[in-house]
Amino acid sequence: MRVKGIQRNWQHLWKWGTLILGLVIICSASDNLWVTVYYGVPVWEDADTPLFCASDAKSYSSEKHNVWATHACVPTDPNPQEIAIENVTENFNMWKNNMVEQMQEDIISLWEESLKPCVKLTPLCITLNCTNVNSANHTEANNTVENKEEIKNCSFKITTERGGKKKEEYALFYKLDVVPISNGNKTSYRLIHCNVSTIKQACPKVNFDPIPIHYCAPAGFAILKCRDKEYNGTGPCKNVSTVQCTHGIKPVVSTQLLLNGSLAEEDIRIRSENFTDNTKVIIVQLNNSIEINCIRPNNNTRKSIPIGPGQAFYATGDIIGDIRQAHCNVSRIKWREMLKNVTAQLRKIYNNKNITFNSSAGGDLEITTHSFNCRGEFFYCNTSGLFNNNISNINNETITLPCKIKQIVRMWQKVGQAMYALPIAGNLVCKSNITGLILTRDGGNNNDSTEETFRPGGGDMRDNWRSELYKYKTVKIKSLGVAPTRARRRVVEREKRAVGLGAVFLGFLGAAGSTMGAASITLTAQVRQLLSGIVQQQSNLLRAIEAQQHLLQLTVWGIKQLQSRVLAIERYLKDQQLLGIWGCSGKLICTTNVPWNTSWSNKSYNEIWDNMTWLEWEREIHNYTQHIYSLIEESQNQQEKNEQDLLALDKWASLWNWFDISNWLWYIRIFIMIVGGLIGLRIVFAVLSIVNRVRQGYSPLSFQTLTHHQREPDRLGKTEEGGGEQDRDRSTRLVSGFLALAWDDLRSLCLFSYHRLRDLVLIAARTVELLGRSSLKGLRLGWEGLKYLWNLLLYWGRELKNSAINLLDTIAIATANGTDRVIEVAQRAYRAILNVPTRIRQGLERALL
């Protein structure tokens, strides 16, 4: 059997392989990514920044909140905006919120300004003779002994303004404001806190009625709001929006009960930093408010007692009518229903344990009672009737909380400071809404207990503000973003325009949940929504400020507002400075020459632009941002240097500039310098020639006329270096006149220059010719070497191909021959086996024959 080898066309394989290799190289080159700068991306990060307040304060009102807000806050925005951010999850933490700390400082400022101490009551830190108040003009059938003892009528001696004489005065004090002196005399008292601090009297005409205050973020920052209805105060929030200012928050200072706050939208919400830690307070936000009415029924009068030059002590002069105790009324039905709902929510948190409520366990009066300020008077109400498990067994429709009033109070904002609050004349009535509770849980080591006891708490006013600011956080807008693209900067033109003053803000944050590709398309529209004037986000607010400038005074808060404006401008200038350094001024999308390094992010191009948001991308490359910025700056510096070198070559780009009149002046100067130099050389050579002739015996001052003499053929003309020349006559042109002499010298100089330049050009041409021949010879030899190597490569390739073909042929032939022999042997064996019966039959036939 014969097998023929099949030859393949290796030349076609070489062509296809080269083509495929080229395509691979082109495709790999096309996947190169370059850093691109984007201005106006919806990216932010957590930040603490000074906020400014806004309120609808009435400048004509003497109420302290209005007075403070007029000086401290700007008018509210008539068109507040709230823009939902889709597909964004943001972490909030109400327990670590700088907005709470700022509000704490602001309300302390409000109280210190409202209750500014004017008069030291040191002259009253004396022994007071006090008795229970007896009303002689009115019946006391309805007055209990406790009510009588609640107010003391105290007499004391005071120094008059003139003559230093002593005068006896009297004033009414609440029982809580005086303490008995332990000397056995039951009528001797002194003012409380006299022995531990200096008591100061607040300025007169203090009136309290909290007004809503809005907190606003300055330009370059934003306030994010969590709108999840089941948000518990910490953790991720999926329903996020951005707002210019918070809702109006009434700064009500109270304990145990939260008054006039915001309500939960659906069920009652219970929040705590750690429910298993009994030292952490529990804030309850109600979904329905409960009205609480507080009354001081006594119609008090106020009297003024002079205690020094220009100083007066204001005290309660008399009580008209019955002496009845101050109290607060709460609807029993609503309170009972609210406690039932709170109990149900607490059972979910504490694994269906029995929930009980009890009164405060003890402590300062401000903690053990519901303390608050009612139009300038400080109420301390006993809430044991509210937090009582037997409340459902009582059928009265109203829960009455007995209250006490103090005029010498300890300031909640500072430790160890006491103040005398002036008495308020007339009846006092305060109507408020209970919108939340502050609870504490009893501790213990028995974790297997089936019962949890909760008591009213409070005292730290930060918890009051936290109950309103739990859904807000401040963030800093990062308007610059970098991302990889396939575009590379080719030519950088000098930009002379700039984008209007802008910082990424509010309006465009709605695109934060979009993919990077979708968000980058709308950058122009986003930037147009940024700022107008100083801050576009606050354009309406600024117009309101301009309309009411007469309301604003440059106080501490005025300076704070100016700082916010300066901060906005600084942030804008910083962004513009970076854009300018990178060569991106006036551009929203700016390509660079910096190649993208996969070590920064190994995600593919499509994965980045089609699946990721700008927020996710910023977190991905956060650790490399500054390094990328520095690389962009270095690349721009190198590009500017290259541009400078290129501009230096641009002077040769236009030959017509050579004929400019300003250039001709330079040409004339250069020509004069060259001619002067040549004349100087001519003079030097002339002097040297004269010296040479003098050495030969000629006289330079001779007046002889040179005549021509015919020499004999056998005589030499000269005896020195000129000797040996035959049949050559020398003559010297005789010229007369300055012009002729100048022309002769100039002609000789030009001829001399021409001859020298001609020689130089010939030498240069010869040199170039030799170099060209050498170069051509080298190139020819190199080309021949390359052709030789190529032919050698083709020869060995052909030999290898032939050897391979011969090898395949030999193997095929050998295999075929071997196969034929094997087949032949097998056939013989098969035929032999088939012939066995025949051979046996033939043998038997022979045997029989």
From Swiss-Prot:
Annotated segments matching region Disordered: 709-729
Site residues, Cleavage: R497, A498
Chain positions of motif YXXL motif: 698-701
GO MF annotations in UniProt: structural molecule activity
Segments crossing the lipid bilayer: 671-691
Segments for region (V5): 446-457, 448-457
Alphabetized InterPro entries for the sequence: Gp120_core_sf, Gp160, GP41-like, HIV1_Gp120
Glycosylation sites: 87, 129, 137, 142, 153, 185, 195, 232, 239, 260, 274, 287, 299, 329, 341, 354, 358, 382, 390, 396, 433, 447, 597, 602, 611, 623
One CC-aspect GO term: membrane
Topological domains annotated Cytoplasmic: 692-849
Processing after translation: Highly glycosylated by host. The high number of glycan on the protein is reffered to as 'glycan shield' because it contributes to hide protein sequence from adaptive immune system.
UniProt-annotated stretches for the region V2: 154-194
Residue ranges that the Swiss-Prot or TrEMBL entry lists as coiled coil: 619-653
Region (CD4-binding loop) location: 360-370
S-palmitoyl cysteine lipid attachment residues: C750
Region ranges (Fusion peptide): 498-518
Keywords, comma-separated and alphabetical: AIDS, Apoptosis, Clathrin-mediated endocytosis of virus by host, Cleavage on pair of basic residues, Coiled coil, Disulfide bond, Fusion of virus membrane with host endosomal membrane, Fusion of virus membrane with host membrane, Glycoprotein, Host cell membrane, Host endosome, Host membrane, Host-virus interaction, Lipoprotein, Membrane, Palmitate, Signal, Transmembrane, Transmembrane helix, Viral attachment to host cell, Viral envelope protein, Viral immunoevasion, Viral penetration into host cytoplasm, Virion, Virus endocytosis by host, Virus entry into host cell
Topological region Extracellular: 32-670
Region (V1): 130-153
BP term (GO), one: fusion of virus membrane with host endosome membrane
Signal sequence residues: 1-31
Chain ranges for the short sequence motif Di-leucine internalization motif as given in the UniProt record: 848-849
Comment text on domains: Some of the most genetically diverse regions of the viral genome are present in Env. They are called variable regions 1 through 5 (V1 through V5). Coreceptor usage of gp120 is determined mainly by the primary structure of the third variable region (V3) in the outer domain of gp120. The sequence of V3 determines which coreceptor, CCR5 and/or CXCR4 (corresponding to R5/macrophage, X4/T cell and R5X4/T cell and macrophage tropism), is used to trigger the fusion potential of the Env complex, and hence which cells the virus can infect. Binding to CCR5 involves a region adjacent in addition to V3. The membrane proximal external region (MPER) present in gp41 is a tryptophan-rich region recognized by the antibodies 2F5, Z13, and 4E10. MPER seems to play a role in fusion.
Family: Belongs to the HIV-1 env protein family.
Full protein name: Envelope glycoprotein gp160
Organism: Human immunodeficiency virus type 1 group M subtype G (isolate 92NG083)
